[in-house]
Each structure stands twice: as C-alpha cells, then as structure tokens.
Amino acid sequence: MPIITSLITLSNTTATEIVGGDNMPHQVTLHNTTKSSNEYVHIGPADMTLANSIHLDPGQTIQITLRPGDVLYGMSDPNGLEVGILDIQNND
C-alpha cells in the first residue's frame, strides 16, 4: 500500500487539486494546519467555491474514503492556508 504525504498551500479564489484520482478506493486524512481562529480549509469537487463547500476548522483533522476516480479539491479562507494530506492507497 503506497502512502503519500503532502502539504499544499491553498488559494481563496481558485480550487486546487489536493488528492488525485486512483483506480482503487483509498483512505485520505486531511488536516487544517492553521491554529488561528476563523481560518478555514474548504474541500469539495472541481467547481467548488467558498460558499458551496464544507470546511475544516483550524487544527481539525478528518478522514474520508475516496472512491475510484474521485478527485478532491481545496480552497482556503483566508488565502494561503496549508492543508496536510496523508493518502493511503490500495494496490491493484
């Protein structure tokens, strides 16, 4: 099982791909690395905006399962926040 870690800086105007698609389901852990109040990492599909997405509170960590072909995008409010990612992929 490949394990991929990354730290991605996000924009508040453009959705950034944070987890690419795979041909197998995979477990993804996301962490909003900021500790300051009212600074949120938003996640969603490619056409996401800050108004139509779910957010991670400062310091929050979540785990989700992505299905084959799913791609996850992120944005931040304010601009320039970082999201930590741990992607545990399954072998074919």
Range-by-range predicted roles:
Residues E39-I43, P78-I88:
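Edge beta-strands of jelly-roll/beta-sandwich modules across compartments, strongly enriched
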Residues H26-V28, L66-G80:
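Noncatalytic modules at the cell exterior or secretory-pathway interfaces
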Residues D57-G69:
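Beta-sandwich interaction modules
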Residues H31-N52:
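Short, surface-exposed beta-strand/strand-loop-strand elements in extracellular ectodomains
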Residues N91-D92:
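Short acidic DE-rich linear segments
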Residues P2-N23:
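Surface-exposed ligand/attachment interfaces on beta-rich extracellular proteins
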Residues G20-K35:
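A short, compositionally biased N-terminal segment around positions ~18-40 that is enriched
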